[in-house]
């Protein structure tokens, strides 16, 4: 979020001084490296500050939506505090709602940078952490001007702390990533929150999103009054996306692990890599397999404590880690259901006689929906493929293909940001290869070819192309027996033990992050998340690649290798041995000389 936007989004005709911002805010903006606003900012900020309009904005990821609402919120709060004649401190003036804890941390981090020079006038409460009731009441009693959290967290404090939270002076309500908020099942929470807020009175509302679905219309009617709707034609902006090169590889289930081993061990990808898997077990299995070959990686999933997750993202952005395996099991559930229904409708049109098959498909869809939602409620505030600001990612590897075409867009959107180039590689399991290797099988891979066709169709509409990528199988085959050795050592029991061990370590680390490292921030750098778990039998010989397996251009030049004797010569040792023999043959020795 704080990264500099791509040139395709910058509006060179305007500068931030033209918005007549507070000098302290202006200094913080320049200190963050921003010289010109983006297109969304140059349109939204004047409408919000001068005309006091509600804003509904649709703009692509990385276009600067966060600053488009934070700058007006901060500026108006500063103006409001200056205009107050009485000395009473106002209550909460702004509420910002985001879909996940990760985004809560990110928005708070950007907010704290912007209020760096006016922190005495504006206090921020971050609801990402699980705070005890007493601590939360203490923080709320200080009347923070801005509260940031997920809808469920905001609703919780409104219901339980009605007397503590002063919302009589509330001026702003922001819902960031609206489409994702609705998809994550927060509609009921939003309806209840609306009962507590002075909507359509003095409340200015911002609804920000990368896409505008029909569901947003209900929020528009409930939360907004004569809003200004800002949309951008993505045709010009999508020219920047040509810097994203996309490939797909048709591979068997076991060959996914083989290709990952070859790619990372031979260093075929330069720079930081983000690998997406579809469930937690897959992430740990891949990590343990790579550990067999001495390849370090760290895990990011919804089981880890929120503090640890944020620390992992921060360290990845600071180049501490170069390989991050992220679990993206919270795919867009609603989109998944819609696509399943589309499949059923197509099948019914093509073959009207197969009504039984269609009914079975409907039943299975319902089963998937209910099963997924049950798991999904547990992970409601976790999201990694959407909105999280991974910086300078050179490559995204879809180790497991996502279950929807939209989820694919969000994943590959983590690279090729801010005008930089990037690569996306997706592994696709052909239907004929599905189920041939049971230990590495993933049920969702059965639909990989269908999902791929949707992805190709969607990308072609955007003027983008996904190219097939073919490995030199002769060179890859040489590594197969080593991968079979390494994969065999990573059993289901080893994966389970790895999950337990990692969770225990991260829980301890989370407490350290929470308490100890607040007092010792320097020691925070020493806390790492890519340590080897070692619950599986590690074979050290697999960490080294024999010369004959390497491509010719990667082998050592034989002409530069000098002669290396089998035994290390020890001239001193030989002399001492000979001298002993001579002494034995020579007979008597002079006692004085010996002394």
UniProtKB/Swiss-Prot annotation:
Residues 568-586 have a biased composition (Basic residues). ATP binds at residues 59-66. A motif (Q motif) lies at residues 14-42. Disulfide bonds: none annotated. It is found in: Nucleus, Nucleolus. It catalyses: ATP + H2O = ADP + phosphate + H(+). GO terms for biological process: maturation of LSU-rRNA from tricistronic rRNA transcript (SSU-rRNA, 5.8S rRNA, LSU-rRNA). Residues 243-477 form the Helicase C-terminal domain. SUPFAM superfamilies: P-loop containing nucleoside triphosphate hydrolases. GO terms for molecular function: ATP binding; ATP hydrolysis activity; DNA helicase activity; DNA/RNA helicase activity; RNA binding; RNA helicase activity. Keywords: ATP-binding, Helicase, Hydrolase, Nucleotide-binding, Nucleus, Ribosome biogenesis, RNA-binding, rRNA processing. Residues 46-230 form the Helicase ATP-binding domain. A motif (DEAD box) lies at residues 176-179. Residues 353-371 have a biased composition (Polar residues). InterPro entries: DEAD/DEAH_box_helicase_dom (IPR011545), DEAD_box_RNA_helicase (IPR050079), Helicase_ATP-bd (IPR014001), Helicase_C-like (IPR001650), P-loop_NTPase (IPR027417), RNA_helicase_DEAD_Q_motif (IPR014014). Its EC number is 3.6.4.13. Residues 349-371, 560-595 are annotated as: Disordered. GO terms for cellular component: cytosol; nucleolus. It is an enzyme of class 3 (hydrolase). Its main location: nucleus. The Q motif is unique to and characteristic of the DEAD box family of RNA helicases and controls ATP binding and hydrolysis. Belongs to the DEAD box helicase family. DDX56/DBP9 subfamily. ATP-binding RNA helicase involved in the biogenesis of 60S ribosomal subunits and is required for the normal formation of 25S and 5.8S rRNAs. This is ATP-dependent RNA helicase DBP9. The lineage of its organism: Eukaryota, Fungi, Dikarya, Ascomycota, Saccharomycotina. The gene is DBP9.
